[in-house]
């Protein structure tokens, strides 16, 4: 699969000082997913500009201190973005974002959030992720194992590489 058909994206591993992770719940006809906040990089943006914009739109987090990349993820699936561009998946770079816990107050309206399939925010502990028995999926599926390494060993010197096909 050509990387020319993969949408570039960024996400934030937004963690409070107790190692809880802020995730957003995306709901689709085929199921719901807990994912890290973020999204596609606009043509005129670099990674940092895109991540600041996405965090503001989806969570209301302003002037976030963005740290090192913690993983890169390639996800193969069919996607049509808001501009009508068709993609065969996306490549995501996930950056560490340490912050005080806050109550999400997205800059996007409820209507704009729903248009992006975003329905909920939640701070998750690693223990809650591991104990979760609901129908929703975490993305990436094994996020808890990556978080365990980050919490116990620190940010990796070289970002994890994650590949997934739907």
Predicted regions span which residues?
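Conserved N-terminal beta-strand and adjoining loop/helix that marks the start
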Residues: 1-21, 40-43, 91-96
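Short Gly/Pro-enriched turn/cap motifs at secondary-structure boundaries
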Residues: 2-4, 84-86, 113
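Short connector loops at helix/strand junctions that flank enzyme active sites
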Residues: 7, 29, 36, 48, ...
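Short, charged/polar surface micro-motifs in flexible loops or helix N-caps
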Residues: 15-20, 29-30, 42-43, 72-77, ...
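Conserved Nudix-box catalytic region and its N-terminal flanking loop in Nudix hydrolases
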Residues: 20-61
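Nudix hydrolase/Nudix homology domain
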Residues: 31-34, 101-166
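A short coil-to-beta-strand element that immediately follows conserved catalytic motifs
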Residues: 62-72
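Active-site-adjacent beta-strand/loop module that shapes the phosphate/pyrophosphate-binding cleft
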Residues: 75-108, 122
